[in-house]
């Protein structure tokens, strides 16, 4: 399988993924196509907290982040095969359990925090906690594998990121939109696969929002952390907003690696786009 980034003139990612004693590129071990249908290796799929949306945890990634909390399935091929059609049916099944319908501009993780803090106090003890936003009726709160909260009308792709192989995401997005009446699609991403060409395809396929994890501003730090350049990742916010996607940016404070200087630079980048 030829690297789709290289075909577009970009550099291949740090995408070696392990399976037993062998290592291959993530797209070779966690993605396949049979009779025109794409299949993705999925570790799990469920209503997640504190995001309050249905998360699909993907195996394999184009980054090799030192701080990855999902390395057991992003850097190691681990999970079950799901076709894009099967994921579309999962989305339809989840839609029947949705308790909160969000407008498109709220298709972010951040907007989950002003709805519910996932403490479960209202369900377990019949009273709200001191930190409860006080917005939702108890009937909107459901239990998931990660705790209590609402179920928002959002399907999110998380875990490993191979958006560089955009055709899978385009096909699965179309399946989700076909199977659901009112469902938004969010991709949690490191941004490495968000080339202008790929963003055009994702927009045309029905993707609504990106949760972009900018891991560092300075390229030397980024490369040490993730194994790749961040050259076009820093351009991604502009390209995303230009195409009318919803954008949320995440940056983690990592002592001695990503501290105030890096976060200030990333903040200025965002501010220049949307003062």
Where do the PLM segments sit?
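Conserved AdoMet/S-adenosylmethionine-binding subsite of the radical SAM
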Residues: 137-275
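N-terminal [4Fe-4S]-dependent radical SAM core
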Residues: 1-58, 66-141
């Amino acid at each position: 399988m030829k690297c789709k980034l290289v075909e577009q003139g970009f550099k291949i990612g740090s995408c070696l993924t392990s399976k037993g004693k062998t290592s291959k590129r993530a797209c070779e071990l966690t993605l396949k196509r049979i009779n025109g249908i794409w299949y993705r290796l999925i570790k799990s799929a469920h209503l997640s907290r504190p995001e309050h949306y249905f998360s699909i945890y993907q195996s394999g990634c184009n980054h090799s982040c030192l701080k990855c909390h999902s390395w057991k399935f992003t850097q190691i091929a681990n999970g079950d095969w799901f076709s894009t059609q099967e994921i579309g049916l999962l989305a339809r099944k989840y839609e029947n359990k949705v308790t909160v319908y969000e407008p498109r501009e709220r298709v972010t993780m951040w907007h989950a925090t002003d709805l519910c803090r996932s403490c479960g106090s209202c369900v377990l003890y019949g009273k709200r906690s001191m930190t409860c936003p006080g917005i939702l009726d108890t009937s909107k709160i459901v239990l998931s594998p990660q705790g209590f909260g609402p179920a928002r009308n959002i399907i999110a792709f998380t875990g490993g990121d191979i958006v560089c192989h955009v055709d899978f995401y385009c096909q699965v997005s179309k399946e989700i939109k076909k199977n659901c009446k009112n469902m938004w699609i969010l991709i949690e991403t490191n941004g490495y696969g968000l080339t202008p060409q790929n963003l055009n395809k994702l927009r045309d396929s029905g993707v609504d929002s990106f949760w972009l994890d900018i891991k560092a501003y300075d390229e030397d730090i980024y490369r040490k952390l993730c194994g790749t350049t961040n050259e076009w990742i820093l351009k991604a916010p502009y390209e995303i907003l230009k195409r009318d996607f919803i954008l949320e940016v995440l940056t983690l404070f990592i002592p001695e690696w990503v501290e105030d200087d890096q976060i200030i630079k990333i903040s200025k980048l965002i501010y220049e786009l949307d003062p």
